[in-house]
Each structure stands twice: as C-alpha cells, then as structure tokens.
Amino acid sequence: MTAICAPPRGCEPDDVIELRSGGARCSLWWGATPSHAGRRTGFIGAIEAEDDDALPAVLSRATDRLRAQGCALAVGPVDGDTWHRYRLVTSSDGTPPFALEPYTDAVASAPWLRAGFAPLETYASYRDDALAARDPRVPALEARLRGAGVTLRVLDLERFDAELEQIHALALRGFRDAPLYAPIGFEAFAALYRPLAPLLDPRLCPVAERDGRIAGVLFALRDPHAPETVVLKTVVRDTDRRLAGLGFVLTDRARAAAHALGATRAISALQHDGSVARSLAADAVVFRRYAVLAKELQ
C-alpha cells in the first residue's frame, strides 16, 4: 500500500524541530527554496505528531526559526520541494484515496489554521465517469498538431531511462512557471519515476514527439486497489505556443485507452486551481480539494 499511495519524502532539510511533548517534529528548508510573489519562502514538511494538539506548538517553533533565517513566508506542508510530497486535503466527498495521492484527513488543516496559516495555492482532483465520450474537437486538434510536426506514440518502457532523460528536460521547461517551482536534477527526478515502471501500462501513457524529441507526455496508471479506475497522474507539454491543445489531445488519448481496456473511471489528479487544464472532460466533477498553506512572517 505504501509503495503506491505515499509519495517519497523530499531532500535533506536545513533543520529539524522536535518537541518531546506530544512527540511532534517537522523539517525545515530555506536555503534553496523558491520565492513566491517576490517573497522569500521557507518550507515546513515531514511532519509527525503523536498528538495533534502538539502541532500548533511545533509549527510556532518552526515559523520562529524561519523568521530568524530571513524568510518572509512560511509555507507547508512541503517536503523540501513540490516534486515530492506536499499539500493537505481540505475537503472531500468521501471517495477513497487513489494511487499516489498525498492523502490526509480533511481535518488535518485545522492545526495549521489555528497556528495562523491560510491557503496559499489550491488544487482539486476530478472524477470522470464518461470515458466512452470523445470530444468532437479532438480530430481537428490532432490534424493541426500533425501539421506542426507532432507525432504520437506510447511510452517505451524498454527504454524507460532514456525516456526519462527527455521527460526530465521537458518537465523543467513545462513546469517552470508553476507556483513554488524549483528545478530538480535528473537522478532525483528518475528516483521518483523509476519505481512507477511496474505500475505503468504504455497504452495509457501517450507521448508526443516533434523534431526527434519528446514534446509532451502523460503518465497514467490503473489503480491497483480499484482496477476500474485510471489515474491521470501527470501531463506536461513543451511551452511552444504552436503546441497549444497538446495536453488536451494526450488526455483524450489516455481516456480512450482506459475505456478500451475496460476502465469506467478516470481521475485527473491534483490540478492547480489557477491553471486547470482545458483537457478536463466536460463531465468531470471535483471530489477532493487540497491546499498549500502559508503564514506571513514579515
């Protein structure tokens, strides 16, 4: 269960705060964290507590430490960077956790709110139970992209590391404008995705190429605990404006493949509210919301 539902922890922290009372501890990062709206951030993550009542106290200690380091904004939970585990669930309709979801109880945000934190960035996961439907706009989009030199294929698991090298470079370009983004080295990136290889079905992972390199990719997998569900985990495309609509096409390909394989539900996971992809199916509905929280320090 852990291997498919718990994303790995992040990089080594700059400090660790620990309270003996309540068994609470957290890790802090500030040395290489990205700014947010021009303000220097410090991250709080890897939080553990035997008693939830101890969390406000350890968060208070953490914010004092980040303030002393010159941070203007304490942000959490973030385990080092947004390539690793981050976010809290803030609301849910009761749908069970899905594969690779950073799931928490919806009440987990309460200690943060009591400590003076508020939502900084918000996200949602969407449920799509109409996989048989194909958007009529897709053929025209595919034709335009073919005219721009784009070809489509499936992920090559026989050359997975070679695929990951190109996907890493693509992700650095495609995600660079995402909130709280910081670049990550190839080995750290590959360490996140290599363990997924046994779970991936290439038919669910469309890849777009142009000029001999990967220009877009979608990672999706069958949920081992709900085989009728396919989780659309990550979609990224090159930022070239001529590739507008490619994310939509990749998502449509994955949905069609899921339907052909007998799946009845697709989950578009952890979409940022400020940039929800237009590739979301028209019938998709929100079933879970998440947030990264922050507290002003200066």
Say what each PLM segment does.
Residues 102-180:
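Acyltransferase donor/substrate-recognition loop-hinge adjacent to the catalytic core
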Residues 1-7, 176-192:
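Conserved GNAT-fold acetyl-CoA-binding loop/helix
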